[in-house]
Amino acid sequence: MILLDGTIVNIAIPDVLTSFQTGFSQVEWVMNAYLLAFAVLLITTGRFGDLYGRKLFFILGGLFFTLASLACGLAPTIGWLIGFRALQGLGGAMMMPNTLSIIANVFMPEERGKAMGFWGAVSGVSLALGPSLGGVLVDTASWRWIFIINVPIGILLIVLAFHFVPESTDPLSVKQIDYPGVAVLTIALFALSFALIEGQKYGWASSLILGLFTVAVVGLVLFILIQRRQVQPLMDLSLFRNRTFSVTNAVAALLMFGMMGVFFLLPVFLQAILGYSAIKAGLVMTPLAAIVIVASPLSGILSDRIGQRWLMFGGMLIAALGFYLTRRVMVMDGSWQSMVVPFVISGFGIGMVTPPSTSAVMGSVVPEKAGQASGVISSVRQIGSLLGIAVMGAVLQNRAVSYLRTGIGDKLDAAPFVLPPGAKEEILDAVASSAVNMGEMRAGGGIGASLPEGVAGSLSQMPASVAGQVADFFRDLFSMDFIMGEFAHAMRTTYLFSVIIMVVGALLATAVSARVKRTRGSGP
């Protein structure tokens, strides 16, 4: 349910934009509110489960997730939806770490591998089914049903867990909860996310955005200092002294950074720009997710034979190639057939990286540190996802505004009539303030549904002989084809950024030890 929710929501992004007639940055918060709560609380809720009962926290998490899902489906405004998504993230963070602890407690050592394999298979199926199931729900019902569908599933989960899952604790493994670390990391990541997502709106050089970047930097420094002084820190920084551990975590973060940024933008391109239905967009995206299921076990087998370094290196480069080829077919007259091969290549590369990165991290630590290492890489991956959506969204908004200002400015310079004084700058300022609001554009017919009041008044006073010419000019200037063409251009630039991220990750992977032996008892 948790993993399915992570992929099913992406396909509903364009409909959420239209439903609330909101901006792209607000929809980024729909994703990042969930990821922020999930990433920061993942390790802490796992430790609460060890202290007070894994079954208890699993059921409480299921209850939180189910109620928050219902609230998301009924949300009256985008603000309420964002808040309820954060509660969903809390529920997910309470459930996820305790699922693995419950499996480890319920199954005997000789059966544990099979149980973990089944857990992984369910995770893979959830990843593959998310886009197509989301498309069906959005087109046949409403985007709200991608959340409401969790309610009966959640109720069933709670009932089954209550009756069939035994309670277990491990209080000796937890000496204290790192509340200061949780608080400081939450503030730092929130400040960084807000600055990246809202920078285009408030201005990158504004005191608010610069202040938030400062808070993020200071917060991260304080977090490191707190971790060094805690008896049982949220993240054991001593683990990062191991080169393989630190580099592999960086590679894992970059993979999720590039992957989630791409997964977030792709449904918008398919639906808002190519005009695909949600069902069609979901089906088109399915090969990208499904091929991960094929590549992951293959990569896991190969990592035991040839080592993790070159699998991670090759996988990141293959994913970079897939993203680059996807970028080339992101054009206004693109077809779904042209996207199949790039999607398959991208999915294969992603699947090649995940198992060896997990294996390298778990094999680089002593058995006593395996639980902490697992928690660190899980949190690092979620933080990578969080920043990927924020940064890629910021790049898209910045480039979209820039390209639209340039394109519209060139057209205004070539206008067959003389514009009123100051009209060009007023129009371009209006473009800058509304270009990122794709929801209003899709619902209202374009940026130019209404000209700035002063410009409209001046144009209405122009001679009747040119009135028709003026109307035709502005109708063409603000046509949806032109606007969406510039957005497609901005998305191609954004995808190029993701290609660079994956190449950097590939280069980092070469610093991993040639073959990391999995330490006995160090986990899956």
Feature map (PLM): residue ranges:
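Transmembrane core module of solute transporters
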Residues: M1-F38, L42, W80, V122, ...
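Cytoplasmic loop-to-transmembrane helix junctions
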Residues: Q26, E111-F118, K369-V376
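Helix-loop-helix hairpins in multi-pass membrane proteins, especially solute transporters
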Residues: L42, G46-G181, S207-L208, D304
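Small-residue-rich alpha-helical segments with characteristic i,i+4
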Residues: S123, L129-P131, M339-M438, T510
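Helix-loop junctions on the cytosolic side of multi-pass membrane transporters
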Residues: V159-Y179, Y202, L225-L234, V331-M332, ...
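Transmembrane-helix exit segments and adjacent C-terminal regions of multi-pass membrane proteins
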Residues: L222-L225, Q232, T244, S359, ...
